[in-house]
């Protein structure tokens, strides 16, 4: 029986989806026991306190959202496998559960380009690898299509201030954007923040600013008004692969490990991006009809009209 500590933020769906993957592996192989350790435990007792608990509990492995100044080597020194869940930067001395963030950024850019947008924006953190690489992938893709000079970004906030932000400068930036703008947020939390600011300041979403997040956290996406579109990742698969890696590391002393890399799967299109940017009066007429009948959006007529709009935009 393998004993795993999952040190993570259980207020978000990412951790539960990761755990689902671990349990899928366990159900098809051997029993696992999982301790769900909240981040507050490490904040209170430090990394040595986490190790002390792990030793008392006889843990075999820990998947943790570690800070980069944490001495994660102490787990290996005590015979415990440690895997880092991406937080600010990747670790070089232990495996990471990370992602193809450039690819995610490109997927967001291609999505907006297909909708005909010519103005683009990114909202994210200044000090996290996953935010920075998503921004780079997004920008490089729109630059390749000739819109490199039509891009603005706001990356003033630290991840340490997750739940605190200064609204006035962010609002000033939003109000300065050319309209309509396609805005890619580094994750769903930040996307939700933008929809909230737009709502209370009468900036119409998606007509003026279309907003796309990442992670497809359904609670957060549906807290947004309008509901937030988001890029979905294979997080459950990542949990399964992390469990496989733990077993290999436990059974083979000198196994060469690779990071577990989550891949973007698709875009869950909700109302925050339900808009096409065009000056063509015929396409605008079709779009107005579609928006008027949103409650019937699953009818074959509206689906056919959506496909027609996509084809007409691609032909331009």
PLM region descriptions:
Residues 1-61, 70-296:
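Bacterial carbohydrate/catabolite-sensing allosteric modules
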Residues 297-316:
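Single conserved hydrophobic/aromatic residue that forms the stacking wall/gate
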Residues 65, 185-186, 301-302:
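Short, well-ordered coil/turn residues at beta-beta hairpins
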């Amino acid at each position: 029986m393998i004993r795993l500590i999952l040190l993570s933020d259980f207020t978000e769906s990412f951790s539960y989806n990761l755990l689902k993957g671990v349990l899928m592996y366990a159900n098809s192989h051997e029993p696992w026991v999982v301790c769900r350790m909240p981040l507050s435990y490490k904040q209170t007792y430090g990394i040595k306190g986490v190790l002390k608990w792990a030793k008392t509990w006889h843990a075999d492995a820990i998947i943790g959202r570690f800070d980069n100044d944490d001495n994660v080597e102490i787990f290996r020194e005590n015979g415990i496998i440690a895997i880092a869940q991406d937080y600010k930067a990747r670790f070089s001395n232990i495996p990471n559960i990370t992602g193809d963030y450039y690819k995610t950024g490109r997927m967001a850019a291609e999505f907006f380009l297909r909708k005909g947008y010519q103005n683009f924006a990114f909202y994210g953190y200044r000090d996290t690898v996953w935010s920075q690489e998503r921004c780079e992938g997004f920008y490089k893709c729109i630059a390749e299509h000739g819109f490199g000079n039509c891009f603005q970004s706001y990356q003033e906030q630290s991840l340490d201030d997750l739940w605190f932000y200064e609204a006035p400068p962010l609002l000033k930036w939003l109000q300065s954007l050319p309209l309509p703008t396609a805005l890619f947020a580094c994750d769903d939390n930040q996307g939700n923040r933008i929809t909230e600011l737009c709502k209370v300041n009468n900036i119409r979403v998606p007509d003026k600013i279309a907003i796309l997040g990442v992670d497809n956290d359904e609670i957060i996406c549906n807290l947004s008004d309008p509901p937030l579109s988001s890029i979905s990742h294979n997080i459950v698969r990542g949990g399964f692969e992390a469990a496989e890696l733990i077993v290999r590391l436990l059974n083979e002393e000198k196994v060469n490990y690779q990071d577990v890399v989550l891949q973007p799967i698709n875009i869950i299109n909700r109302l925050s991006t339900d808009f096409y940017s065009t000056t063509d009066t015929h396409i605008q007429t079709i779009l107005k009809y579609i928006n008027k009948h949103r409650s019937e959006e699953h009818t074959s007529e509206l689906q056919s009209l959506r496909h027609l709009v996509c084809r007409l935009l691609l032909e331009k």
